[in-house]
């Protein structure tokens, strides 16, 4: 009987021993995904600018930083927060981005119907933001630092992206959303890097 009980305990022991390597592998995988998507986000932003016409892309052009409901750029104080809190903010931003990117894609389909690659990039970006956000949330759960309670839906995110009237404001708002997408992916990549061996979490 005692032998049987001992055999039942062995898998638990093995599981506890392998937890750390498994968690490290999960962190590396999520960090690699964030790194790859950051590169894609840079390509998306460059292609978006190229297809909007003048004055977009001109060195002298400084577009207004339109506010986007439900999403802002990473705050200057972000880097000083504990890494788990930073990752919670990253996950929230990644959850807010897909409806914004979807709305920009729909607007660009009207403004640039002959730019299928840009539209495909925007569609992919929305899916990729969802995937990375889910991966970050799963990692937080594995670390025992998941958000408590149901996640709040992004407030009026889609309405914000779709509400710009006129061609120029719509293009500027799309540029802002693509820029925020790149900023938050880069920030997420950096925050995940703090959890890797050699990081300063």
Curated annotation (Swiss-Prot):
Major place of residence: secreted
Subcellular location as annotated: Secreted
GO terms, molecular function: cytokine activity; leukemia inhibitory factor receptor binding
Tissue: Highly expressed in heart, skeletal muscle, prostate and ovary. Lower levels in lung, kidney, pancreas, thymus, testis and small intestine. Little or no expression in brain, placenta, liver, spleen, colon or peripheral blood leukocytes.
Cellular compartments per GO CC: extracellular region; extracellular space
UniProt keyword terms in alphabetical order: Cytokine, Secreted
Keyword Secreted: yes
UniProt record, GO biological process: cell surface receptor signaling pathway via JAK-STAT; cell-cell signaling; muscle organ development; nervous system development; neuron development; neuron differentiation; positive regulation of cell population proliferation; positive regulation of tyrosine phosphorylation of STAT protein
Keyword NAD: no
InterPro entries: 4_helix_cytokine-like_core (IPR009079), PRF/CT (IPR010681)
Membership in a protein family: Belongs to the IL-6 superfamily.
PANTHER family: CARDIOTROPHIN-1, PTHR21353
Known function: Induces cardiac myocyte hypertrophy in vitro. Binds to and activates the ILST/gp130 receptor.
Protein name listed in UniProt: Cardiotrophin-1
Organism the protein comes from: Homo sapiens
Underlying gene: CTF1
